[in-house]
Amino acid sequence: MLQTGKALRVSIYLSEGSRHHTTASEASILDYLLRSGISGASVFKGVAGFGVDHHVHSVSFVELSDHLPVKVEFTETKEKVDELLGKLTELAGTGSIEIQETTVVKAASRLKAAAAG
């Protein structure tokens, strides 16, 4: 479980329509992180963005884009990130991965989370 102190925040940028085999890339990554014992991860869907092709994809009332930006993000120890990075690179496909040093000032507790729910 993630503790307070130095950690790494990993952001994986994908296109909404990207797939790993037959599954959405973000779902494959989230499943892998869950099975790997990561404390928590989130998936964020953007309303507009562009990638290396420099073509802007955005939500419009006329047509919904299937190439909107999606970001999977989690924070974990350097050792755990190093352990997972090879598989994450495979699952991200043509997406990009960004890693930033960060400091966790308050880590979630399973006991407290269970009591709140």
What are these regions (language model features)?
Residues 1-117:
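Positively charged, small/polar-rich N-terminal and surface patches that mediate targeting and assembly
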